[in-house]
């Protein structure tokens, strides 16, 4: 940290342009108004594709100064938030008007959540299954009921009011998006003032946001959940505002602290924090009534997070000559072997939003995958852990979202390299040095992929062969040649024992996934130790293989986006181009865009195996029923350890055996999943028509169809064109992923709703 002389400091100001862009509905009504070429209108059918491809590519618009692009992004953020608020409002509205929330709240272990009732127009009423409590509807797996209970929502009217609040917020966001682009648009220096931005985001969004949530948890969620856990009916519990306005209600539940506007904070400032130990706890483990984390633990967590981030929001130097400067930190950050280190990165990240976005997407994607793993190992909401369909859905959802964001990070990294990279700024710094030894990086990564691929598949094929020959004693398994994941087992053991030393007052381990007892709620397993064996060791190395291949493709795309041995001037061809002519041993599918295209398939590959592993492992070794004497019966009876050792086992005992429910769903409330399963297979197959396509064949076909139209004098004025190679690939990968994801969705849900 440095303290600078006042004359060196440039004062931070909020500077805006007034009325920079007129609000013109007439202009917006003209398709392609943002681009001179597109605004002329269509000559050929390619125009409509370009319209969609470029509408959000602000760099290509007619006015594309850095300032204007920054303003458009800023404004679009508000539009995005408006869409999110409308979407959330719809969720809450369904909860208010079409759900069995109150019935679920009264009996969450037997009643299933439902917030959608289908109108029986031509017999669709069959989809409204009996979810318990006398309610018929579609079982939902979003986890919203559990979240609402954790928030302290006790009736449908509260959901209705919140839904209206969501629409009000959406309106405010739309207004803000318009206002900050058309009326008062910030100047470029405001967008580039990173210290103020960090301070506001850290202290404001994360710090005060967490503090607000902690306050809500303490004053509303905790008392309401304490009463619900004790068996008090929701209708007999005081309303949220009563707990806030009436201190005696809180004193009855949490007598240690004196409740009142001023009295309540005295223990905080006199360091008598023990007074808060009724509701700011450090118990560890799960609440045995609900199978979720102790809400008093999560309130404590959010309060601690708030304190950390509010302090963090005072770290950076703005108008007071004290604190860190981002540029100074980056330029001082160099090691003995890294040349100029991080020099130049400040300029890069303040002038290239693609570079900034690439980092943010990679980080948020990784975070989403971390969230996926915490949702089952440390289920945050009441009765979430025993709602197996919701657990499976939340894991799958957060894995896929994470995968898409990480691929997006590579996409924008490559766009940065092509459009924004400045060789003058990046001289012998980390970025330059990585690019200069990219051949070593990529060839090593390639070797790792080959090694992992052959060895991990080799182990499976060995097992398939030995099982076919009737030689189980020669297989890699827990009962023959063991390949135990000893490091993973050591880490599990370490995490089970460590809190005894690091958090001696905690009552239970951090997560029962690592070790400890079985937590059962309503006769179902909420969480229990997840034992790892040879089958997990094998599939783990398949995960390692597929993830490394995904990284290889994406990283190669970024590092070779500007140039390669075959195409030294690749940067001039742009982010996406189909080929660079014949000869030279092949120049097709080498653009930055093509690497993203190929990376998406491997991302899908990787995550399919991850969610299959999770689904089968949990059904086999975790999820199931608990008898009064404590005996656990798992859904598939622990068959993972022996069946998942061979490729045939995965095909027969997972895919085929567990598809029985979706294939046999016709005539039941799950029949929609049967139709989706079929339809999504069709969408997936349709994608192959675009991926294995010959563009010339289609263009020829189109020409002969146009000839026929000309003969009949009904030819269109806009010339039809076959899809370009890039367009075909884009349509192909979109349908491939949509078909694959919807197929998996139908397969998973039909199965787990039937047996879970």
UniProtKB/Swiss-Prot annotation:
Native source species: Cyanothece sp. (strain PCC 7425 / ATCC 29141)
Protein keywords: 4Fe-4S, Chlorophyll, Chromophore, Electron transport, Iron, Iron-sulfur, Magnesium, Membrane, Metal-binding, Oxidoreductase, Photosynthesis, Photosystem I, Thylakoid, Transmembrane, Transmembrane helix, Transport
Enzyme class: oxidoreductase
NCBIfam families documented for this protein: psaA (TIGR01335)
GO CC annotations on file: photosystem I; plasma membrane-derived thylakoid membrane
Subunit structure: The PsaA/B heterodimer binds the P700 chlorophyll special pair and subsequent electron acceptors. PSI consists of a core antenna complex that captures photons, and an electron transfer chain that converts photonic excitation into a charge separation. The cyanobacterial PSI reaction center is composed of one copy each of PsaA,B,C,D,E,F,I,J,K,L,M and X, and forms trimeric complexes.
Protein name: Photosystem I P700 chlorophyll a apoprotein A1
UniProt main location, coarse: membrane
